[in-house]
Amino acid sequence: MQGPTLAVLGALLAVAVSLPTPAPRVTVYVDPPAYPMPRYNYTERWHTTGPIPSPFADGREQPVEVRYAASAAACDMLALIADPQVGRTLWEAVRRHARAYNATVIWYKIESGCARPLYYMEYTECEPRKHFGYCRYRTPPFWDSFLAGFAYPTDDELGLIMAAPARLVEGQYRRALYIDGTVAYTDFMVWLPAGDCWFSKLDAARGYTFSACFPAREYEQNKVLRLTYLTQYYPQEAHKAIVDYWFMRHGGVVPPYFEESKGYEPPPAADGGSPAPPGDDEAREDEGETEDGAAGREGNGGPPGPEGDGESPTPEANGGAEGEPKPGPSPDADRPEGWPSLEAITHPPPAPATPAAPDAVPVGVGIGIAAAAIACVAAAAAGAYFVYTRRRGAGPLPRKPKKLPAFGNVNYSALPG
């Protein structure tokens, strides 16, 4: 009797030992990092607000590379990395003897019939003989405030790192890289494992979620403005430090490096374009009833705004309704102690300088200046009159003898008179 009982107890003990130990839901102390310096010197240049280009401009003549990014565990980091062959592009610029190039990097989240702008960065007067982004001028990085709380660009500023992303982050992302007006698209299909990370930047009570989603027509009509729907954030060096610090305080381990995302073969699109429909009404009606479309709307703060009226999605349509997720607090809430706040490093575009009004002159001083001017004019007039009268009394000035041409070998002058 004892033998079978001990065997059963041993089997139960073995099963218990093999079960994963639940991670403690506590934060740990991590030395706050110092505010990092930029990798090189550059001038931060603001631009007047302008439209964000449409992510739906691809087609047969503009192929899209598709990658697959997956996370091993709910509380891990996730990397969206794909080489856009930018080194080859810069080498071709060197061969053309180009002295500089301009570039823009934009990230979107592609939904059913619409796209959410997530990140926008411009580079001007860049050196083609150096690595990408080594430029004389740069704009501040503009972010979706929710994504900025747990994601940051890679060191080359072409990839994207996410720390413990929540379930609603799953889906399709598109990176648009513009170099001197030529665009290269890369799509990333993000997959997350089952379960939720306890410290992900998502809380139903506080309502963290993405911002508005815009159909293709609103991008084409230049209604999606970068300074209206995106927020200025820390530079890449500081952004990486603040997210890594938050991640490590919750027990996370930052990998020493991230591998490139694997290739992915998407299902063939009907028109050879993007795997996501560009937002026409028929596609929205057909896909709005599917299970995936319903899940996407629930996980991303409500359905996109109506397309029939051509207006931007309303706050209620993007998470503003009661009981639905709403935009969260400022993404710099987890900044290390002693760091400047987000408000301290951000500034609006400088207003045009207005000339200052001249200071008022006292009445007494003005009268004195006028009297002195009148006296000077009177003295000058008196001097001119004195010289004129002297010349009249002396008679006309003697005329200089006129030189006449020689006659033979004799030179002579005409007599005065």
Swiss-Prot record:
The record's disulfide annotation reads C75-C197, C114-C213, C126-C135
Q: Name one GO biological process term.
A: symbiont entry into host cell
Gene Ontology cellular component annotations, sorted alphabetically: membrane; viral envelope; virion membrane
Name the residue ranges with Acidic residues bias.
279-292
**Keywords tagged on the record:** Disulfide bond, Glycoprotein, Host-virus interaction, Membrane, Signal, Transmembrane, Transmembrane helix, Viral attachment to host cell, Viral attachment to host entry receptor, Viral envelope protein, Virion, Virus entry into host cell
> Intravirion face: residue ranges?
390-417
Attached carbohydrates are found at N41, N102
Where is the protein localized? Virion membrane
- From the UniProt annotation, give the residues forming the signal peptide: 1-18
Report how it sits in the membrane: Single-pass type I membrane protein
Q: What does this protein do?
A: Envelope glycoprotein that binds to host cell entry receptors, promoting the virus entry into host cells. May trigger fusion with host membrane, by recruiting the fusion machinery composed of gB and gH/gL.
The text of the family note is: Belongs to the herpesviridae glycoprotein D family.
Protein's name according to its UniProt entry: Envelope glycoprotein D
Q: What is the lineage of its organism?
A: Viruses, Duplodnaviria, Heunggongvirae, Peploviricota, Herviviricetes
What would be the name of the gene that encodes this protein?
Answer: gD
